């Protein structure tokens, strides 16, 4: 059975691991190694999702997507963002045509967070 709260519990665990010893915690090590290491893991996991999909292996797609989501949650923690921030953005987009939403972003009418991301460099 699906448990939608698992993402919140996982995000809380990741947040708690920020204070852990990087030698004892994979999450703490990723956060200690910095954004570029986290981004490298996200790129790697994204590629693995693509390959699993091309192979038509549904079980592998699920497992690799879980890895990708996990590393995206680590990236959010790195930027001191919360899962709720992403959910709020999805909620904001709900019911809006993808074409209209993309046009609004191109026109600069929607905050896409790029300015905020660049502040963390």
UniProtKB/Swiss-Prot annotation:
<comment type="pathway">
    <text>Amino-acid biosynthesis; L-histidine biosynthesis; L-histidine from 5-phospho-alpha-D-ribose 1-diphosphate: step 2/9.</text>
</comment>
<keyword id="KW-0368">Histidine biosynthesis</keyword>
<dbReference type="GO" id="GO:0004636">
    <property type="term" value="F:phosphoribosyl-ATP diphosphatase activity"/>
</dbReference>
<keyword id="KW-0067">ATP-binding</keyword>
<keyword id="KW-0963">Cytoplasm</keyword>
<dbReference type="GO" id="GO:0005737">
    <property type="term" value="C:cytoplasm"/>
</dbReference>
<dbReference type="GO" id="GO:0000105">
    <property type="term" value="P:L-histidine biosynthetic process"/>
</dbReference>
<keyword id="KW-0378">Hydrolase</keyword>
<dbReference type="GO" id="GO:0005524">
    <property type="term" value="F:ATP binding"/>
</dbReference>
<keyword id="KW-0028">Amino-acid biosynthesis</keyword>
<keyword id="KW-0547">Nucleotide-binding</keyword>
<protein>
    <recommendedName>
        <fullName>Phosphoribosyl-ATP pyrophosphatase</fullName>
        <ecNumber>3.6.1.31</ecNumber>
    </recommendedName>
</protein>
<comment type="similarity">
    <text>Belongs to the PRA-PH family.</text>
</comment>
<dbReference type="InterPro" id="IPR021130">
    <property type="entry name" value="PRib-ATP_PPHydrolase-like"/>
</dbReference>
<dbReference type="Pfam" id="PF01503">
    <property type="entry name" value="PRA-PH"/>
</dbReference>
<dbReference type="InterPro" id="IPR008179">
    <property type="entry name" value="HisE"/>
</dbReference>
């Amino acid at each position: 059975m699906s448990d939608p709260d698992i993402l919140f519990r996982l995000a809380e665990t990741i947040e708690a691991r920020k204070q852990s010893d990087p030698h004892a915690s994979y999450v703490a090590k990723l956060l200690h190694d910095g954004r570029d290491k986290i981004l490298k893991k996200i790129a790697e996991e994204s590629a693995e999702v693509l390959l699993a999909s091309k192979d038509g292996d549904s079980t592998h797609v699920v497992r690799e997507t879980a890895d990708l989501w996990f590393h995206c949650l680590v990236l959010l923690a790195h930027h001191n963002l919360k899962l709720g921030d992403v959910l709020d953005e999805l909620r904001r987009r709900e019911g809006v045509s993808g074409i209209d939403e993309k046009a609004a972003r191109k026109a600069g009418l929607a905050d896409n967070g790029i300015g905020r991301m660049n502040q963390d460099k």
